[in-house]
A protein has these predicted regions:
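N-terminal glycine-rich phosphate-binding loop and ensuing alpha1 helix
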Residues: 1-19
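Conserved core of the sugar-phosphate nucleotidyltransferase
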Residues: 58-62, 71-74, 80-169
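Generic beta-sheet signal
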Residues: 18, 38, 78, 105-106
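Short beta-strand scaffold positions
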Residues: 18-19, 145, 175
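A short acidic, often aromatic-flanked loop/helix-cap motif at beta-alpha or helix-coil junctions
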Residues: 41-46, 110-113, 170-173
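Short phosphate-binding loop-to-helix
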Residues: 2, 22-76, 84-88, 92
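Hydrophobic helical membrane-anchoring modules
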Residues: 165-166, 170-190
Length: 190
């Protein structure tokens, strides 16, 4: 399972697992991680068609209130749907907290990019070389890094002065659909 792949990568770290799966909870009970059952109200919000946003911020707030006493402790939230993210990458990104208040994984794209029909990173009146374009940065859910203090001040994993840490393939694979799953399987098998 994906969660085991990530836990293997995080071996030796202080790891907390929030799950609604009895199988995962029971599998991790006697392991070197703190596993706790997801609050039913968060499960209900995930399936509530009237609740238009993810309850992830509520879940993080619950975790911080329950388990984190030091408001300056660095919190890293890797996601199991990014199975190829490396501990070394997250450590490198966390080093930026000396200058920035948070860090998020991202991918950089040097392509002619439009948003709502308008150019984002180029002048449409000038033919530029693709390699000369300003990269467009897209957030990737592989990880978010912040402190309890930053989260409480912003009610978000991303603070007011974030660093967007670029990751590349295969670490940037994020499994959101069947095609992503198939790609991850192919990469894993190689």
């Amino acid at each position: 399972p994906l969660f085991k792949h990530l836990l293997d990568e995080l071996q030796g770290q202080d790891v907390y697992v929030d799950t609604d799966s009895d199988m995962i909870f029971n599998d991790l009970k006697n392991k070197d991680v703190t596993c706790y059952k997801r609050n039913q109200k968060f499960i209900d919000l995930e399936t509530d068609g009237d609740f238009k946003v993810s309850p992830v911020l509520l879940m993080i707030e619950n975790f911080l209130d329950k388990y984190v006493t030091d408001e300056n402790e660095v919190i890293v939230t890797p996601h199991v749907t990014s199975p190829f993210i490396k501990l070394s990458t997250m450590r490198d990104a966390a080093a930026y907290l000396d200058v920035f208040d948070s860090a998020q994984a991202c991918t950089e794209h040097k392509e002619f990019t439009y948003f709502k029909g308008q150019p984002v990173n180029f002048n449409p009146d000038v033919v530029q070389k693709t390699q000369d374009l300003e990269p467009v940065v897209m957030g990737n859910g592989a990880f978010f890094i912040f402190t309890k203090k930053v989260f409480k001040e912003n009610n978000n994993r991303v603070g007011k002065n974030p660093y967007f840490y670029p990751i590349t393939f295969p670490e940037s694979i994020e499994i959101d659909n069947d095609k992503d799953w198939e790609l991850a399987e192919r990469v894993y098998e190689e």
